[in-house]
Amino acid sequence: MDSVISRNGKPIRLTDERWAHITEEHCELAGLRIEVLETVENPDKVFQGNSEELIAVRELEKGKFLAIIYREFPRDGFIITAFLTRRIKSLSRRKQIWSR
């Protein structure tokens, strides 16, 4: 298990089980575990998710973004899923919580 500190100062966990699930659904993320953690810790932007979750976004290369869905609680939180996208406009329609 790994953890990083979110923009809100909460430790966010990424368990081995969750990482296995993420890479099973999104095989293109295999080998990007460090980048996933770094995106939560040092995102370009954070958006509000559908309910209680947050979406940390970071541009990996020109026009290619890594999006991490995670949940925070009063003491800590955890990563739910992650994906690569080029459709930043669809994420930008959401309420922006934080920006670099």
Model regions and ranges:
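Ribonuclease/tRNase effector modules and their secretory precursors
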Residues: 1-100
